[in-house]
């Protein structure tokens, strides 16, 4: 799919490194628990490295990776891509300009959509602490990085509470089988019903129907309300076909043939993503709050939860002269600055992820550039 020659295709990272140095740098996107060993080996083999977040699963492994980078002289860069979005660049610029006055409090929320939570943290690779990292690290190290970047201070005090409230056996609908494909009596009423998420891609189409671009928003609504007409239009206008015959995330993570409904259904019948969300081996939290105090007296709350109708981050920064409100979501991205003295409002809008079809609101491309 990516035009990689067969000689440079490998089953695992060990085979890739054992093949000898074939490039100047590696992009290490292995699973969290593999970061330490693969990163150490790659730097010792002479590669510069862009490492997917989080750096590692423990503090000792993180420090070992950093020390190895220093010892080998290799460049080590972490994929905190949100710093490179136009949205968060603007937030940072407004803070540093002094327009908000003294920063008093920041309320930052990571609203993980209900189907993303089910896909990644209930059915998927980050569901269990024994095989991956805590959700606050796996999902919110982006946000913690942003807070340090905004404030240029290190937190001095913090506390945190959270738990797994919903995705448990006791919340299963009466008669719910182990798999959604085994005749679940709650198929029509359960928002986590796997065929609706992966075969019909309803949550993705709903997100597109909320896009800020009116043309994209209208077509998203058409795919939901008149799927037959939308499919016919998609054949005439190829860019629209990417939605009517959707094969992107999360569908493309459960099978090697995401264009095939048959392959997707087979994955749901046999793989982890067809499991009932109430009958999985998940043990990570589905909501958590972190409270922080910084040396200057600034207080910060970071809230993360996996029950949002819409994926994205919301932000409120209260200063002595103005309040900043922001929304950075799959469908919309905007910032407002409300000035205390004049009552004036400055509003900035940005292309959303769906508007520009770019990962992390343009942050992925921004980091690589």
Question: Where are the regions a protein language model picked out?
Answer:
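C-terminal helical cap and adjacent loop that interface with cofactors, partners, or active-site loops
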Residues: 1-3, 247, 251-262, 270-369
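Rossmann-fold dehydrogenase core element
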Residues: 64-81, 101-108
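Beta-loop-alpha module in the N-terminal Rossmann-like domain of NAD(P)-dependent dehydrogenases
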Residues: 5-68
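Hydrophobic residues in well-ordered beta-strands that form the structural core
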Residues: 28, 51-52, 78, 107, ...
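Predominantly a Rossmann-like dinucleotide-binding segment in NAD(P)-dependent oxidoreductases
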Residues: 82-267, 273
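A structural signal for well-ordered alpha-helical segments within the folded catalytic domains
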Residues: 36-40, 63, 85, 89, ...
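Non-transmembrane alpha-helical segments in soluble domains
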Residues: 1, 14-17, 40, 66, ...
């Amino acid at each position: 799919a990516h035009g990689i020659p067969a000689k440079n295709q490998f089953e695992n990272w060990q085979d890739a490194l054992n093949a000898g140095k074939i490039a100047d740098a590696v992009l290490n996107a292995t699973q969290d628990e593999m970061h330490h060993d693969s990163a150490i080996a790659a730097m010792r083999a002479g590669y510069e490295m862009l490492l997917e977040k989080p750096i590692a699963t423990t503090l000792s492994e993180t420090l070992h990776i950093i020390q190895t980078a220093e010892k080998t002289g290799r460049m080590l860069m972490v994929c905190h891509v949100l710093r490179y979005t136009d949205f968060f660049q603007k937030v940072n610029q407004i803070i540093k300009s002094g327009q908000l006055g003294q920063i008093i409090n920041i309320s930052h929320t990571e609203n993980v959509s209900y189907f993303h939570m089910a896909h990644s943290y209930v059915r998927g690779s980050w569901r269990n602490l024994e095989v991956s990292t805590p959700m606050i690290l796996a999902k919110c190290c982006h946000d913690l990085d942003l807070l340090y970047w905004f404030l240029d201070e290190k937190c001095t005090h913090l506390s945190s509470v959270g738990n797994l409230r919903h995705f448990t056996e006791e919340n299963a609908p009466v008669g719910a089988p182990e798999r959604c494909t085994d005749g679940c009596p709650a198929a029509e009423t359960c928002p986590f019903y796997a065929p609706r998420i992966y075969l019909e891609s309803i949550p993705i189409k709903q997100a597109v129907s909320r896009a800020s671009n009116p043309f994209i928003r209208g077509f998203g609504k058409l795919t939901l309300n008149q799927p037959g007409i939308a499919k016919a239009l998609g054949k005439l206008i190829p860019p629209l076909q990417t939605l009517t015959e959707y094969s992107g995330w999360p569908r493309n993570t459960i099978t090697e043939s995401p264009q095939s409904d048959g392959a997707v259904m087979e994955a749901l019948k046999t793989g982890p993503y067809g499991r009932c969300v109430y009958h999985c081996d998940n043990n990570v939290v589905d909501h958590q709050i972190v409270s922080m105090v910084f040396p200057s007296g600034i207080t910060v709350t970071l809230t993360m939860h996996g029950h949002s109708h819409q994926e994205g981050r919301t932000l409120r920064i209260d200063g002595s002269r103005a309040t900043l409100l922001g929304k950075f979501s799959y469908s919309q991205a905007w910032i407002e600055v409300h000035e205390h003295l004049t009552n004036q409002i400055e509003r900035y809008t940005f292309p959303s992820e769906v508007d520009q079809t770019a990962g992390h609101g343009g942050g992925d491309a921004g980091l690589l550039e």
